[in-house]
Amino acid sequence: MFNLYSLIMHDFTLLSTGAVLCTVGLLVLLFFFREKILRYKCLRFWESNAEDHQNIEAFLKNYGSYAPKRYNYSEVKRMTSCFKNKLGQGGYGSVYKGTLQNGSHVAVKVLNGLKGNGEEFINEVASISRTSHVNVVSLEGFCFEGCKRALIYKFMPNGSLEKFIYEERSDSVRQLGWPILYKVALGIARGLEYLHRGCTTRILHFDIKPHNILLDEDFCPKISDFGLAKLCMKKESIVSMLGARGTIGYIAPEIVCRNLGGVSHKSDVYSYGMMVLEMVGGRKNVDVGVDRTSEIYFPHWLYQRIELDEELQLIGIMNEEEKECARKMVMVSLWCIQTDPSNRPSMSKVVEMLEGKLDSLQMPPKPYLYSPSRSEVDSLEVGSYQCSRSNV
């Protein structure tokens, strides 16, 4: 009996020791592989960072004195008083108010250092450095120091357009009156016309939306955020693109479903039209919080009113001049959101239509106004860009 007990205890001790050794071995292996993975990620990060630095240096060399000023990170901290006054935040990072040594105010967009490989950052610096227009934001400088990246813009006292068109208001008063709304819409159109035709290299923005339109003290609009922009030669009409880019609600159909036509400057025209429709309505074109999309898709409702020559019933219209202004903005927008890119006007034509008389505008063809369901919007928001017959 005693020998049996001793034998059992001996076997138990061996099993316990084996289990402990096995556990220790697994922990050692896990630690080894963890170190390998961390070392690999670290190596990839520094390789990417080194490549970014090479691209930035090449960019500075190519542009010489035309390149924006480069600041080091300590200067960025000093101009923002150690990031004291935060203006906003998004997926890209945060924006802070700052002051340059000459006393002028700036908005400093500090990017998430470990996000991506720096392509969007370099893209934005390269794009805006090619521009000089009253309706395009001016880049005062940038910072690229290790994983610390920042873009420094001229400060816009009135912030972005979105806060003036979506915030709560009364049933009869708008935050921005119709003369200012028209001025903003025309200014954005002129800025896009410049990007498409006025630059040595054509710039396609691909993310036109109220959030990316900044307003100065006189409500003069400035197109901003060129992180998704694409540069191409002026003679090029169709550009190649891997994957969809833009924001749901403003993305042109051909970007999601390539069988509808090639991606070109007409994609910006579509985004512009959708944005102006939200400006005149003071609301989102699609309310993703409601499932009955037939009842909530604003462009459908507007087209029916125009087609039947009925009052648009838009908020804040005080006289016949404002009524004509509103109707003109709606007509132009409905031309811009045509499903077929070839049916959309160029931005030069948009400017011409906005500056012309209402009675000179032809009724636009009825576009295939597609309003996505809530589930489809949710799937698009997480990056699942799919094309089917139901949404073309």
Question: Where on the chain are the PLM-derived regions?
Answer:
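Conserved eukaryotic protein kinase-like
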Residues: 7, 11-392
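Extracellular/luminal ectodomains of secreted and membrane glycoproteins with large N-terminal domains
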Residues: 1-6
